[in-house]
Amino acid sequence: MTAVSCGDLIEVVYTPDMRRKTFHYVLNTPACAPNIALAVGPFEIFVDPYMHEVTHFCLPQLLPSLKVSAKYMHEAFEFYEEILSNRYPYSCYKQVFVDEIDEDINAYATMSILNTNLLHSTAIIDQVYITKKAMAQAIAEQFFGCFISMHNWSDTWLPKGISTYLTGLYAKKCFGNNEYREWIQSELQEVVKYEEQFGGIILDPSQAPAPLPIAANTPAPAPRAPDPGFYFPIKNLHTMSPRYIEVLRKKAHLIMRMLEHRIGQELLLQVFNKQLSLAANAAQQKIESGLWSHMLISTNVFAKAIFTVTGKDMSVFIDQWVRTGGHAKFSLSFVFNRKRNTVELEIRQDTAHQRGIRKYVGPLVVNIQELDGTFKHTLQIEGTMARADITCHSKSRRNKKKKIPLCTGEEVDMDLSAMDDSPVLWIRLDPEMTIMRAVQIEQPDYQWQYQLRHERDVTAQLEAIVALQHHSTPATRLALTDTIENEHCYYKVRLRAAHCLTKVANAMVATWAGPPAMLAIFRKLFGSASCRRIIKQNNFSNFQHYFLQKTIPVAMAGLRNAHGICPPEVLAFLMDLFKYNDNSKNRYSDNYYRAALIEALGATVTPVISVQQGTAITAESLSIDTKAILEEVTRNLNLEKLLPCYKYTVSVACLKVIRILQKFGHLPSNPHIFRAYAAYGQFIDVRIAALEALVDFTRVDGKWEDLEFLLDMAEMDPHPGIRHRLVRLMVENPPFERAHKHRLDRPDLVDRIWNLINGMLSHDAKLRCDLVDLYYTLYGTKVPFCLPIPELATIMKPRKAGPPSPEREIKPVPVQHVKHETIDEIENSPAPNKRKSSPNRDPTGPPNSAEHGTEIKRQKIASNQDERGIPIPGEGKVKSEYYSDNSASLPGIMGTPGPVGFEPGMFKKDLEEHKPKSDSVNKSKKKKKDKKKHKHKHKHKHDHKHNKEKEKEKKEKDKGKDKEKDNKKDKDSSALKIKDETLSSASSSQSPEPTVTNEFLFP
């Protein structure tokens, strides 16, 4: 066993019997306590051949994969040291790969603990991008995150944002500018989507932004409605939703990039250099010097550093984007004025009042591509509506000129026959993504087609593809087809174009002529020369073709004919791909390709057209196509057990297809196969796929036992990553919709989640916050739908003014048959107005009537220990305001304030005071109640309660006598009496003789 910790290894000391050893590490650089780590295991050790200060540790038999995965890691060190003009701040660096951790990367001082699943061999393609970026992120966090750490919780955006920004620069160097810009665009879209769903993310909530300056003669702006905020505190990392933290990192990265555009990349890197230099100097001093504060970074320190280096005051920027949440949302439309040769632009911010969206005031860049080139215009946006007349530099020469200069300087030939008289080819808003924004541009379909074909920016091409989904025309079909075939086009644009063509083809199904979309393209690219139907042997040396070969079959599987089913030619084509798949001479693994083919089979499945109710699904009842799909999936799933592939990607795809077949009625809906694959010991990706299917099954067909299975696993599974991922799956696909009656919506569920949140997960803040998200998804911030509303009980049953009753019904120990008895008793009761009492703590008290004055009411309580049990949380019919010290109320279910805990003298033992005169008092009270026609009746355990309907019809005198008789019966049998507003006990059997009698006295 080897122990790995922070700092330099000084010595290893063995005990005399050589059975134990002690590792001594020394860290000479000051470090925060959370940045100290320890990893112990039977590690294999590999010293980096390029940088001897770097050591790698992995579990047994993974050393070959480790050498491949970390082969180019030294380049990241060199890149960071070069752009930051600073040496790596520590004397060594250790990478430890371990199993069963929650996060893929965990950075600590001088060491990082990474997930074993990041390792890969030379035969794997897809994982390389993920692993390289993850290792680069871990190294970047050594500079900002470990060496320079946050000053307060609210400053966490700085180390997260700076380290991710540096990782992005390295990714741009490794994978190219197109990959980098597509990554930035996807992060921006993710932040926008999250903020519009939940609210604006405030990166630094510790200080409110400064108020905007207002001129003396300018009227004050109308105050904006206060943001309701999130359903969790955002000032501490241990209370934030894990999803919120994930999106906060992305937003912090984007804000750093915005800062780069405002002060320049070189100056921003100088700011980082200054902070590192000050910290490196402070690290060599003793704590008495008072310089260690330079090793902490805060928003104010960062703003001052920018001012020191650049001379620019960025306080307005900080207030606008760091201390204020939300993003801008623009809608752009334009009209070409032929007479004046101008473009009349209109930019609206109509949705500025909606959640997560705010009004933007400031400069906004608009790029107009004209016949004579690209022209950049900067508009000043001040209100929610901005108009501008922009003079065009070129006139419409549709048939005179075809060489069009682009923003890159190159000239391209364009077919201008689709144009009208406008010289505008397309318009872009904020093309460099320099602000947090969402953009909607209204322009004709031919302009989107020009933008897709000829714009060189990948983000513009991706925007055009999204827009063309809504323009299903032959011209759009041709533009998308040309994009898929264009070898000079970025591969991710080609993949998106394939999926877009699927939607366009389905919309054009009535007029579509020829073979299914993309079939000819695939056979042209990958079919053998002699017979196009037979696919060539796999050769993944061209990565663009590899990703196309994976994606086109999945896109084609989404095609539908006029009847709404997948064309038979497509299914036959997919079966041929399985049949002729030959990877024998390929240097790369085809596991991701085979998984994609299985995913494509699942995408061809459509719901069963007609099914007779009650007919069992058998092998004979399956259609020929479904049987072929099922046989192929089963064959691959069984083959995986004999010849497992990297990360079991084929098994993951098979499980997803089996769930699709179940969901669409081709297979019996059964969770047992998924439970087997979700068991501890299976590979984590297989478990997650099985759990995803189980979560979906629970939502569609699940019973209470299925939901309990998921909750048990989320609470007790040994793998922390599985616990977290399972709850996230339940948040994304909840077992039922909020505010709708559902068979799974029970008080038991409310109690279980609530108790986990409040008392059981103090050691695991991440899982606790996951469950907070789940609770919010199911119930929001209001009373759960399965719990009766306390106010409704008050309205239905008027009560006497007075202090809350300390009575509390005592429920027997929970047994399954007791629940059935309770249900039977309620169903058999002749009283039509009975309703189930609230399982939460309702404000209770005597009936609210001024006539009753200050009469003393005494209730006799049987306290037989055999009848008593532990009340089930959420099910016990609690009518008291006396809680235990550890109790916690559900949000929105607060009763009338009263004493908390048990007070001295609250329960007074008096066995002799319960005299008949108290019965006469009760008799006179009930006469008055009957005069006012109140419907309050004591609910007893005995058969006399079935006479209550007859009692309504009797005269007042008879009623009083009946009540007196009832009270005598209760006294003789010593039955448990319940307050007016509660139901009878769950037990329908007669109570045994009481051992103790308690009196409750009300003033």
Q: What annotation goes with each model-predicted range?
A:
Residues 445-448, 476-484, 512-529, 568-580, ...:
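HEAT/HEAT-like alpha-solenoid repeats
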Residues 689, 695-788:
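Extended alpha-helical scaffolding segments
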Residues 819-1003:
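Extended, charge-dense intrinsically disordered regions
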Residues 25, 56-355:
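Hydrophobic alpha-helical and helix-loop surface patches within well-folded domains
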Residues 469, 502-506, 557, 598-606, ...:
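Structural signature of alpha-helical solenoid repeat scaffolds
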